[in-house]
Amino acid sequence: AAPALKESIRHGVTTVMIGSCSISMVLSPAEDCADLFTRVESVPRQHVLPLLKERKHWSSAREYAAFLDQHPLGPNICSFLGHSDLRVAVLGLERSVDAHYKPTEADLQHMQRLLEEALDEGLLGLSSMTNPWDKLDGDRQRSKSLPSTYATWKEYRRLTMLLRQRGAIHQSARN
């Protein structure tokens, strides 16, 4: 682990953008983050999960920003809040990938609140994914599509309205 990313800096990289395609590690527990990330990014789960369990002590955007701020990072870091991460944090992993579950009004308000907190902490906006080919890892919901793909247009509309009000970005991969 070399947080300064000196090799990247030597190659002229000045900014690293993370949290795209609905996958961030801001809100959800370590095991859920590993399930979201490892298969999509082809990084072995047996390496990612122990590292997350050891080092991920945050569960809010404020704590995440504080974690990043305390490290001597070489490049600038900017991040999106991943929609799959947001859905898992609010609905739990199982409901977030249940095609029959529709978020309640309270669920949607909770998502909006967490997105607003992330924007307040300097995150760029929300990233989402509508491509059903990216799959979860782990043994609990393995091979189901990412949680963002299960969102209704109503859910997207509610979150996008907040992004528009705040002048924030909605990054998405199309189907």
Which ranges hold each PLM region?
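Histidine/acidic residue-rich metal-binding segments in metalloenzymes
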Residues: 62-73, 100-175
